[in-house]
From Swiss-Prot:
Region described as Disordered: spans on this chain: 1-75, 114-193, 248-272
Modified residues (Phosphoserine): 2, 91, 162, 169-170, 206
Origin: domain of life: Eukaryota
Entries under SUPFAM superfamilies matching the protein: Troponin coil-coiled subunits (SSF90250)
Record carries keyword Secreted: no
Comp. bias regions, Acidic residues: 1-50
Stated name of the protein: Troponin T, fast skeletal muscle
Keywords, comma-separated and alphabetical: Acetylation, Muscle protein, Phosphoprotein
GO biological process, one term: regulation of muscle contraction
Length: 272
């Protein structure tokens, strides 16, 4: 028997029960205010009830050739409830699985963003180190050029002073001694700078520490620029002193040549 036929039988059965209940309610007597009238009314109603035929209860119509299996109906209802419950459970687990997948995807996106941020910080640090490396290379190149220039100047001084004779031997010795001291000091400075110049490792630093490190580097760069300016002024003074010394040497050489020419003229005059 199909579900539709079963539902039709149940609805028909319920409608007949409701009709019987309405008939019983219509036949119920109303109470009277006077006791005698109530008794008479009850007797009259009893007589009418005896005379009136009672309604016959009829069983629900069942299609011929088929029987209603209430166990089957109850089983189908249970199966329907079970299927609905199983559907709710499946939908709950599907929603839970979807939430877990979204959470895993969110974690993966967060890790990916962290890796990208770390890579960007590393690239930024490398770009920031490039100007520093260029400054260091430029400084080393300038120092090397200055050393070559000083060596050439020293050679020129030696040649100029060697023509002046033994009077300037002590001066050359002192100049060599000073130059040796300067060279030693320069080598010591290079060694100290090489020891102080350490690789900059900032990959593990946080934002606050990076700001502190940047401020520290800025202060160091500012101090280096200040020292550079002071050394430049000192170099200018030294160049001025060297120029003054050269002019004095040239004047001394001129006076010595004039004195030698005068002495030769006197000797020649005597022999004549």
């Amino acid at each position: 028997m199909s579900d539709e036929e079963t539902e039709q039988v149940e609805e028909q059965y319920e409608e007949e029960e409701e009709a019987q209940e309405e008939e019983v309610q219509e036949e119920a007597p109303e109470p009277e205010e006077v006791q005698e009238d109530a008794v008479a009314e009850e007797e009259r109603e009893e007589d009418e009830e005896e005379e009136k035929p009672r309604p016959k209860l009829t069983a629900p119509k069942i299609p011929e050739g088929e029987k209603v299996d209430f166990d089957d109906i109850q089983k189908k209802r249970q199966n329907k409830d079970l299927m609905e419950l199983q559907a709710l459970i499946d939908s709950h687990f599907e929603a839970r699985k979807k939430e877990e997948e979204e959470l895993i995807a969110l974690k993966e996106r967060i890790e990916k963003r962290r890796a990208e941020r770390a890579e960007q910080q590393r690239i930024r640090a490398e770009k920031e180190r490039e100007p520093q490396n260029r400054l260091a290379e430029e400084k080393a190149r300038r120092e090397e050029e200055d050393a070559k220039r000083r060596a050439e100047d020293d050679m020129k001084k030696k040649k100029a002073l060697s023509s002046m004779g033994a009077n300037y031997s002590s001066y050359l010795a002192k100049a060599d001694q000073k130059r040796g001291k300067k060279q030693t000091a320069r080598e010591m400075k290079k060694k100290i700078l090489a020891e102080r110049r350490k690789p900059l490792n900032i990959d593990h630093l946080s934002d606050d520490k990076l700001r502190d490190k940047a401020k520290e580097l800025w202060d160091t760069l500012y101090q280096l620029e200040t020292d550079k300016f002071e050394f430049g002024e000192k170099l200018k003074r030294q160049k001025y002193d060297i120029t003054t010394l050269r002019s004095r040497i040239d004047q001394a050489q001129k006076h010595s040549k004039k004195a030698g020419a005068t002495a030769k003229g006197k000797v020649g005059g005597r022999w004549k």
